[in-house]
Amino acid sequence: RVLLAPLVAALLFQPRASARLVAGVVYLVAAVSDLIDCEIARRRGEITNFVKLVDPIADKLLLAATLIPFWIVTESDPQLGGLPIFGGIPLWTLLVFFGREILVTVLRTRAARSGTVVPAMPIGKYKAAAQSVFSGSMIAWLALRTAAAEKDWSGGTYQAWESFHGWFTTITLILALILTV
């Protein structure tokens, strides 16, 4: 995931729908590989203190690789945002997400220095899952909006899908924010 995060970010900065669609596929591979890695490690009893410390950092890098480019791209072209309620991603949501992640990372690092490993709590895992679903949905949203602009989509089917997907993405953002605080 650490290696895939910069690729996701670079692809999201590309102005073509195809690049943003590939970003979504790469993101999906990274997210699914995280689930598979964790499950395999759990089954084999190979969850080390190092993994407990590094895994959340990889999650944060992947989150940053999606949220920051999405915010920058939609700020530079507001038509690509268009989420219900929010438009794009408000800057304050990034501050909430990253503020919490920085605080938790600092606290975990301090605990690790004193020999204590603080594993993720169940609520933290739900938060990470909500953020992951939101990030994936947001990448798909950006690819969809970019494709619509490139291909001049405007029909009823597109509008229905855009409305559904926009609300789904907005609801997952709200859920991720609630679980973050």
Name what the model sees in each region.
Residues 36-52, 110-120:
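Cytosolic, membrane-interface loops and tails of multi-pass inner-membrane proteins
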Residues 2-5, 9, 17, 22-28, ...:
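A feature for the membrane-embedded catalytic helix bundles of lipid/isoprenoid biosynthetic enzymes
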